[in-house]
Amino acid sequence: IELEGLEGDAFEAAQYVQGAGRFTAATITAHHLLYNRNAIFTGGIRPHYYCLPVLKREEHRLALVQAATSGSDRYFLGTDSAPHPAHLKEHASGCAGCYTAHAAMELYAEAFDAAGALDRLEGFASVHGAALYGLPRNSGTLSLVRESWTPPDSFAFGEAELKPLRAGEALAWRVQG
């Protein structure tokens, strides 16, 4: 289940997942942990924050953060990164989806850090999903360092350009190496 995609109250959705059978779990995106629906409209319409399901009210964002950072094995990373060319995002019928692949782990680290739960990020990102599906854990590792950096304004995307989430805005974490 994509937790933020369940209709209605995110707190009730999280309770449903937690109380369901052991093979029921939910993924949660970094952008739904970091932003509420106001992000789409701050300073004018920001099409690169438009996604489906649409970002929720603040109380629902907080419920998603609580679920993700709880340490429960019922919740795990689901980037749902959506690389749409900028010209298809920036018009009247713009495509839904946030491009987060360029900084997925850094965005999740910001969310978990803000919640005081960095110690639970590894389980959410690397352990819970594999365990649910009966898969071995990855043998490789990555390291996150608290180091400010700014994603580029865009990436080449075939003949078009791709504007990532947080383009031109500082991120607090960086994958080392």
Feature annotation, model-predicted:
Residues 1-77:
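Histidine/acidic residue-rich metal-binding segments in metalloenzymes
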Residues 70-137:
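His/Asp/Glu-enriched, well-ordered alpha-helical/loop segment
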Residues 31, 82-84, 149:
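Short, glycine-/Ser/Thr-/acidic-enriched flexible segments
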Residues 37, 88-90, 144:
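Residue-level detector of alpha-helical segments with a strong bias toward transmembrane helices
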Residues 139-177:
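C-terminal cap of metal-dependent C-N hydrolases
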Residues 13, 134-141:
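Short amphipathic alpha-helical segments with coiled-coil-like heptad repeat character
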Residues 7, 80-81, 146:
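A general secondary-structure junction signal
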